[in-house]
Curated annotation (Swiss-Prot):
Name of this chain's protein: Ribulose bisphosphate carboxylase small subunit, chloroplastic 3
Native source species: Solanum tuberosum (Potato)
UniProt keyword Zinc present: no
Biological process annotations from GO: photorespiration; reductive pentose-phosphate cycle
One cellular-component annotation, GO: chloroplast
Gene name of the record: RBCS3
Record flagged with keyword Transit peptide: yes
Function, as annotated: RuBisCO catalyzes two reactions: the carboxylation of D-ribulose 1,5-bisphosphate, the primary event in carbon dioxide fixation, as well as the oxidative fragmentation of the pentose substrate. Both reactions occur simultaneously and in competition at the same active site. Although the small subunit is not catalytic it is essential for maximal activity.
InterPro entries on file: RuBisCO_ssu, RuBisCO_ssu_dom, RuBisCO_ssu_N, RuBisCO_ssu_sf
Additional record remark: The basic functional RuBisCO is composed of a large chain homodimer in a 'head-to-tail' conformation. In form I RuBisCO this homodimer is arranged in a barrel-like tetramer with the small subunits forming a tetrameric 'cap' on each end of the 'barrel'.
Tree of life domain: Eukaryota
Amino acid sequence: MASSVMSSAAVATRGNGAQASMVAPFTGLKSAASFPVSRKQNLDITSIASNGGRVRCMQVWPPINMKKYETLSYLPDLSDEQLLKEVEYLLKNGWVPCLEFETEHGFVYRENNKSPGYYDGRYWTMWKLPMFGCTDATQVLAEVEEAKKAYPQAWIRIIGFDNVRQVQCISFIAYKPEGY
């Protein structure tokens, strides 16, 4: 019993060369008061609420004569250079490029079902076969040009298909007919 009782002063005063490099055991979290506070301590509730006086809010999509095609369809049409970069990104990720076209409705619409979350126009006609093994973005753009010649009044989109996960990873409009 006497050997298990020991004075903490005796342990602390004993100096040894090996103990000098030892790390002190974890003693818990330190008080938050020792850390510098960089945020403003304002408990006034009126300062939290704001109508965004200096912030310009984003407007909603105008519903009249503005058709929605894809997720980012509010952006301007892609130039040939931007289209080439998108296809290079698609190929760099190992996705299989595939072209689809739609001659009647290139936009979201409801005809067969009125429930929320459902819309027609999701499935387009495939242009030829998926381009398995394609490594050159200019080949994909050459197919887009060929599809434009065959169907000048059609919407054409490029999708990137991951054949390992069996999912579509990217989709964007490559061509819209005149007037859209």
